[in-house]
């Protein structure tokens, strides 16, 4: 294991313990604060095709964001991945009822069954906004994911499909997920902003 991978592994273990101590009530309180900042933002209001992660424990909850986006008539895409694959697709949520009935699959993450054949984003065009999760975030726009590399590869794949279209990349964080620094490798992709209760960190105003 390389030095960077080892440090990231230790960071994930530390954050897992830390985030496990946060109550559901506190997570919900911070989620509501982040939700208000998101729906009031210009980039959310103007977005037409956005990707939103489907939340689990220990992170900002996204059900209300997805519901709001659908109510506003936006095209909402969520992650879909399969066991043994390193690739992650973003597939369109048909409607609120379909989202509410998502089964819990790998790692307890809700996603559609492959046989449902939800439409992939690249069949109809680029995304203009991606709301990404993470284990930890730095004050400089770096994120530490869960170690599978799904989002970094997805960012790269989106660029290959649509090199002229760069979606806004936003990280959503609990306050406890903001740390001083994160070791990086050449495949790590920087975010444009990190949104959390009490503050917004902007790294790229393009």
From Swiss-Prot:
The UniProt annotation places Mg(2+) binding at 152, 188
EC number, UniProt record: 6.3.3.2
Q: Which GO terms describe its cellular component?
A: cytoplasm; mitochondrion
* Matching InterPro entries: FTHF_cligase, FTHF_cligase-like_sf, NagB/RpiA_transferase-like
Regarding protein family, the annotation reads: Belongs to the 5-formyltetrahydrofolate cyclo-ligase family.
Q: What is this protein called?
A: Probable 5-formyltetrahydrofolate cyclo-ligase
* Residues involved in substrate binding: 54, 59, 146-150
Quote the record's binding site residues for ATP.
8-12, 143-151
Any one GO molecular function term: 5-formyltetrahydrofolate cyclo-ligase activity
Q: Which reaction does it catalyse?
A: (6S)-5-formyl-5,6,7,8-tetrahydrofolate + ATP = (6R)-5,10-methenyltetrahydrofolate + ADP + phosphate
- Residues making up the signal peptide according to the UniProt record: none
What's the chief localization of this chain? cytoplasm
Spell out the SUPFAM superfamilies in the cross-references. Answer: NagB/RpiA/CoA transferase-like
Give the protein's function.
Contributes to tetrahydrofolate metabolism. Helps regulate carbon flow through the folate-dependent one-carbon metabolic network that supplies carbon for the biosynthesis of purines, thymidine and amino acids. Catalyzes the irreversible conversion of 5-formyltetrahydrofolate (5-CHO-H(4)PteGlu) to yield 5,10-methenyltetrahydrofolate.
- Cofactor entry: Mg(2+)
Q: Among its keywords, does the record have Oxidoreductase? A: no
């Amino acid at each position: 294991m390389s030095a960077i991978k080892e440090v990231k592994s230790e960071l994930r273990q530390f954050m897992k313990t830390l985030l496990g101590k946060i109550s559901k009530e506190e997570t919900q309180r911070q989620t509501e604060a982040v939700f208000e900042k998101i729906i009031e933002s210009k980039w959310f209001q103007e977005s037409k095709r956005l990707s939103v992660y489907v939340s689990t424990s220990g992170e900002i909850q996204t059900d209300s964001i997805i519901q709001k986006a659908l109510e506003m008539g936006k095209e909402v895409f969520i992650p879909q991945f399969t066991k043994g694959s390193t690739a992650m697709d973003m597939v369109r949520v048909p409607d609120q009822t379909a989202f509410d009935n998502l089964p819990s699959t790998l790692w307890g993450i809700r996603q559609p069954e492959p046989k449902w054949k939800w439409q992939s984003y690249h069949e109809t065009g680029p995304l203009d906004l991606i709301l990404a999760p993470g284990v930890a975030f730095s004050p400089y726009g770096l994120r530490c994911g869960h170690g599978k590399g799904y989002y970094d590869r997805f960012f790269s794949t989106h660029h290959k499909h649509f090199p002229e279209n760069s979606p806004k990349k936003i990280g959503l964080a609990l306050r406890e997920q903001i740390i001083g620094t994160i070791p990086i490798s050449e495949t790590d992709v920087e975010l444009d902003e990190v949104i959390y209760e009490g503050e917004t960190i902007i790294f790229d105003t393009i």
